[in-house]
Amino acid sequence: MTRLHFASALLPSGWANDVQVVITAGAIAEVTPGVAPASGDEHHDIALPGLASLHSHAFQRGMAGLAELRGDSTDTFWTWREAMYRFALAMTPDDVAAVATLLYVEMLEQGFTRVGEFHYLHHDRDGSPYADIGEMAARIAQAAEASGIALTLLPSFYAHGSFGGAAPHADQRRFICTVDQFAALVSASREAIEQLPGANIGIAPHSLRAVTPAELAAIIPLADGGPVHIHAAEQVKEVEDCLAWSGQRPVQWLLEHAPVDRRWCLIHATHTTDEEVTAFAKTGAVAGLCPITEASLGDGIFSAREFVGAGGAFGIGTDSNVLVGVADELRQLEYGQRLKHRERNVLSAGAGRSTGRALFDHALSGGARALAQMSVGLTPGARADIVTLDTTHPSLAGRARDAVIDGWIFAAGSCAVDCVWAGGDKVVEGGRHRLRQTARERFNASVRRLVA
């Protein structure tokens, strides 16, 4: 049993002072506000629930910053994708484990306590399945176990190079599965996370480019009631190609032909009409927004104000993992809306309300829904995922309650996280994960070889 005491903590009911939290077997057993610290309590100033990065491609952390040279032609998502394919083709299972471990350490240091790993690097370099088809999934699970982050594993089905069942490109060979192979992969992935505390599983049809309607219908039952994530309408070209194939836009097609509901998460959904935004919001599906990656790749800006106004739910993901941070993603999301609408505090819940708090609340609830977490936050029964902030940071000085969140997101950024408990285990202290040094050494050794 662990007893923590916080001068101020954000509970599901709102802020409370002098809060004692009792942790048993990795879960929150008791939350008692309005009490003085007892002998043996570990005391901290500000406590928040940990957030989820609902969308991650862990292996891409290894190539962060390596695609910033302009090519001969217009540089776009599609030219970046070619660089990503080349990097993916070189990686071994040991490389994937090393890169994912450091990534998850970094996520925890930034206040992410769960990750939705949209995992599509499945096979050996020649495209043939490993003897254990779940080899790469097992390496992701090992990385999660080593770091302490909670894992929602989302094995991705990827069969085609474009709409209408087009043949895949040679550089996509490590991703490609038949429906039968994917069923075996999902089964192996379940085994990989079976003993992992806090882990669960869903599926991720990669995109309408990569899966036919018949294949989509065939694989959805493999989710077995778990989350279903899919990339949708990230790029203008994707929308144009979908229109040429079907006469419909990607989100429009999904809403009319797939059983999209609260289990689903549409990643990006950047290029949508007003009608799509409203219909999407009504399904209860989550918009998986990855503002830093969307900016990095030149994708565009999601219609967040309109989506939230229609009652939509969103969470945040780190996607390409070019930069990892709770505050960074939420700040980029709000600043993108400010640039789009030429206004300030666009995603605030109303006059006199904190923008940072609104962003945080959406990310907490939307991330939990997208990753099938029934109980989340500082409440009895929830996994004990807790983040404390360093109130000595100059950007948090003199702040209280919602103003602390504003100071963290819009000013202090990545430097403000102090301690993190993941499943009741204190994995970060003084802003530093206990595995940071060894994880960095393994990562550096892998990446030096990969880029040589």
Language model feature labels by segment:
Residues 49-61, 227-236:
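Histidine-centered catalytic micro-motifs
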Residues 236-248, 276-281, 298-307, 322-341, ...:
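Histidine/acidic-residue-rich catalytic or RNA/ligand-binding cores of hydrolases
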Residues 65-150, 180-196, 444-452:
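Alpha-helical scaffold segments that flank or form the walls of functional sites
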Residues 62-97, 124-133, 160-180, 236-261, ...:
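Active-site gating loops and adjacent loop-to-helix segments of metal-dependent hydrolytic enzymes
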Residues 256-259, 263, 305-393:
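His/Asp/Glu-enriched, well-ordered alpha-helical/loop segment
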